[in-house]
């Protein structure tokens, strides 16, 4: 099955620096007087406080409640860039939290991911020069691809790549975008020649090329920029396993033991790293 890989980032990384990154890269409340007032017009809306509320709720893994605070901001200012990107992030999380045991889970997840894409594209329209709008376009499309038919996955592969590349071009220090691109390259490289021929014949569309070497390069860059993010080390180890570079994979998986648990899925990924290390320990 063709999976484009961006989903990995949005599933397991609660973006620690998204607030600061958005603040420094397009959040107008730092420079626009109407965002600096303590008693804003229109029923006393305090946008800065609403952002703080949303950030606190998100840190507590309450994505739904955080989204409600962000919607209050958009009801007053529909072009608030920071609220738009945070809403995209929140809807990705809401989709991820829907278990497969729920009737109609795929449709429910798809609705959340489409909402995430919608907010991300609105963010790009408001501030096309920010890395985060493009990044969340890629992230939302990656999640959509995971639960879509193969034809749709093939269609989205190039769009995901383009959004990631744009995100990186706008901020060469966006480690999350490098992470996503590293996983994307591995997923594309893992698709065999026959599968590519079938995709071309059956779906009338060629698949983008991927490279294990570039997967290593981009995931190493992600780790350099975010050295304590567990999932980047785990994904680089998976690339090394795919390349049968067992010593490099073992070294990375072992290093995860000492990393602090920072995000909601870190414990799960530490466990997976331990399982993988056990599997390849004698390779």
Annotate each PLM feature:
Residues 230-268:
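C-terminal/domain-terminus segments
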Residues 36-39, 57-65, 89-129, 137-173, ...:
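Short coil/linker segments at helix-helix boundaries
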Residues 5-17:
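Bacterial N-terminal signal peptides
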Residues 22-41, 194-201, 251, 258-283:
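Terminal, low-structured helical/coil segments at or just beyond the last alpha-helical repeat
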Residues 52, 86, 93, 136, ...:
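"A position-specific structural signal for the A-helix of alpha-solenoid helical repeats
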Residues 21-71, 75, 81-86, 90-99:
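N-terminal leader/linker segments that initiate helical-solenoid repeat arrays
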Residues 75, 125, 224, 257-258:
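Amphipathic alpha-helical segments of tetratricopeptide repeats
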